[in-house]
């Protein structure tokens, strides 16, 4: 389902609601430590109390210049940095300190038995008195389920408006910014933000148009077990001048066998584990060297294996997805794509030689 496929008004009238979660200046660049800057004029929309239930929505709200209207966020919202101080209305029920294999097994088991991955703090949500709640229905693993949020909204005073973000592609990610802008009455301002982001995407695409060689790329969203990338990420690889042969544009990520990865023989590997920063991802990397045939892959032989902050970038469908594109383009074609000021490069791993 695409962006805006669900109605804004929560479907109320339910009785005996069971709380079960079946399971994120003129140039917009969100990798600074201050709240994202916005265009010339401050958006003039109605004062609202906004609660964001996914990190990408939090970044969208702030990119639109609505930092002061944001009153509540999730336990995972961490950018811009000031949002870490806002009241939290969710918590995870999965031990994040567990191994990647254990996390994967726990998530699969809970989804199979329809047990919660997250809990929603209804008393805190009620105390925040939101006018607008931004949620998602894209991924059962990434955030509180949309139907759970709509059920909660029906129990809150005033029945706040609920909007659902469900982007599958980069175009739909940018459209979700306009969706939030329309919900708060600043459509024109949102259009300006999207135009700026689109110009950056087009600049990358223009530079890749004349490339003589597009390397085979494996963008991995998990390592144990390995997962392909999905949704917008294969599109990012294409726009950055690569070819993604394991993930499909606009489709969910999927579990892989290492034999599949090695059969693709990627010339470049980008590891962007969903929900993990670089430090946490690096804990899993040594196991790669033990995968039979891995060190003989084209990427390892040429030293083109990178780790990025998957939590902050590639798996967060907000304004910084364009940063992700620029980061990826620089990693694949550094001479063609200079790294923009203020954006850290992908971390290149030293491949061991046994």
Where are the regions a protein language model picked out?
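Detector for intrinsically disordered, low-structure N-terminal pre-sequences
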Residues: 2, 16, 27, 44, ...
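N-terminal ligand-binding lobe of clamshell/alpha-beta domains
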Residues: 41-354
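Short, basic, low-complexity termini and linkers enriched in Ser/Thr/Gly/Pro
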Residues: 11-22, 31-45
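Intrinsic, low-complexity polybasic segments
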Residues: 5, 25-26, 30
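Extreme N-terminal basic, low-complexity initiation segments
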Residues: 1-9, 14
């Amino acid at each position: 389902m695409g962006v805006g496929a669900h109605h804004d008004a929560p479907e109320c009238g339910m009785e005996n609601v069971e709380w079960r979660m079946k399971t994120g200046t003129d140039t917009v660049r969100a990798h600074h430590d201050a709240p994202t800057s916005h265009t010339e004029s401050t958006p003039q929309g109605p004062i609202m109390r906004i609660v964001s239930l996914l990190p990408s929505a939090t970044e969208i709200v702030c990119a639109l210049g609505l930092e002061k209207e944001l009153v509540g966020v999730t336990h995972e919202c961490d950018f811009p940095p000031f949002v870490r101080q806002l009241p939290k209305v969710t918590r995870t029920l999965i031990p994040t300190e567990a191994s990647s294999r254990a996390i994967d097994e726990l998530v699969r088991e809970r989804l199979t038995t329809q047990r919660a991955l997250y809990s929603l703090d209804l008393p805190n949500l009620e105390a925040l008195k939101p006018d607008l709640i931004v949620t998602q229905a894209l991924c059962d693993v990434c955030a509180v389920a949309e139907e759970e949020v709509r059920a909660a909204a029906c129990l809150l005073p005033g029945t706040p408006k609920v909007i659902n973000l469900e982007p599958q592609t980069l175009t739909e990610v940018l459209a979700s910014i306009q969706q939030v802008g329309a919900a708060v009455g600043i459509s024109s301002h949102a259009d300006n933000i999207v135009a700026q982001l689109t110009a950056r995407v087009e600049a990358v695409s223009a530079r890749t148009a004349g490339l003589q060689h597009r390397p085979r790329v494996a963008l991995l969203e998990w390592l144990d077990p390995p997962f392909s990338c999905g949704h917008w990420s294969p599109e990012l690889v294409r726009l950055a001048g690569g070819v993604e042969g394991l993930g499909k544009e606009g489709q969910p990520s999927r579990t892989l066998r290492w034999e599949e990865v090695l059969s693709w023989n990627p010339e470049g590997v980008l590891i962007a584990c969903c929900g993990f920063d670089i430090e946490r991802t690096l804990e899993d990397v040594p196991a790669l060297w033990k995968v039979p045939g891995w060190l003989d892959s084209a990427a390892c032989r040429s030293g083109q294996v990178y780790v990025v902050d998957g939590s902050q970038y590639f798996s967060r469908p907000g304004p910084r997805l364009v940063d992700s594109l620029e980061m990826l383009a620089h990693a694949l074609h550094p001479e063609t794509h200079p790294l923009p000021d203020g954006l850290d490069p992908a971390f290149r791993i030293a491949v061991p030689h046994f």
